[in-house]
């Protein structure tokens, strides 16, 4: 690690209480203690492999030049190239980016994908950008991180505030500099550029599978079980659609403006949101706040928006029997402890929302082979990998009297630690 990145890592490891990074580090510390790993393991696993902070200039449509901070954190490359999304969001910072890259590391190891973890992004509100400005910002950010990414090094993907269009621009920018087409440099691309069928819905599909299996393990028939979903975007919408198709009853969903109940069809509600930009005042619905949604008396609650949705202040009101974390880090440690004390089964983010990176892996494999799968093959293979991980976590939690979060973290951390030991320390 360079001197600069070591300083950044040190700065990133002094987070405020219950920040995403503090939460991630506390979970890692607990996993290391439970696994009886050494302080050498802690020192290795708690430190990002590489941190890049860049200035991203943007020429606005009116000719003004504005500067934005960009990041790319490669937390681990021990098990393979690092993998993780690119966020465009005004509130991202180094601490959050390191935390999310760390979670990606354990997520990839838990699902046994041959990847390490990464995360990146630009501190910008994408809603303030024109299409041309978004393209210029995406391409300039790509050019700034270009020396450290590649299909065998670090593979970005869409995240909050980015989509397949951004991935197309990133792939093209990298390919133009390489002198030939390199579709495998990113995943989540349009189908015609080497994307995979099933990638758009993959995270939501994985959440739906996690909900179904958690209900079965709790002895609850999924058919007719009730679900409330906070968030109705890339994860929440597709999860709601898949759950409805499985026969579950999605009784409430929300976006940043608040939530709604009483709708008849998830697809019709989504169409209304696309046409109006909000769920507010959707015909035939009743409104509720996001906090009220968290406290509904449903079988399953799915927080699928941003982090820190369930906190010490809101956790005691959670009445759901099961919480399935569709978002990254939606629960603070204090909120987690309260729900555990209240007997709520929490399916952690690194398991529940791993469908996205699993199908990203499929896309990467297809790009490397130039051989593409059917939608049915993608869904079957996603289910196989995720079901195996769910079974491993559930069995470990039961056998060792752990929470599912503890079991999932221990499995992921143990695999990365083992890989570190087997590779050794150079020189």
Regions of interest found by a model, annotated:
Residues 11, 15-18, 35, 214-215, ...:
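Adenosine-phosphate binding glycine-rich loop
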Residues 258-346:
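Rossmann-like adenosine-cofactor binding region
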Residues 39-44, 112, 149-158, 181-184, ...:
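Flexible, glycine/charged-enriched surface loops at secondary-structure junctions
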Residues 12-55:
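Short, Gly/Pro- and small/polar-rich lid/capping loops
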Residues 54-126:
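Glycine-rich, N-terminal phosphate-binding loop and its surrounding beta-alpha-beta segment
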Residues 89, 109-223:
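Glycine/serine-rich phosphate-binding loop and adjoining beta1-alpha1 elements at the start
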Residues 190, 195-295:
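Glycine-rich phosphate/diphosphate-binding loop of Rossmann-like nucleotide-binding domains
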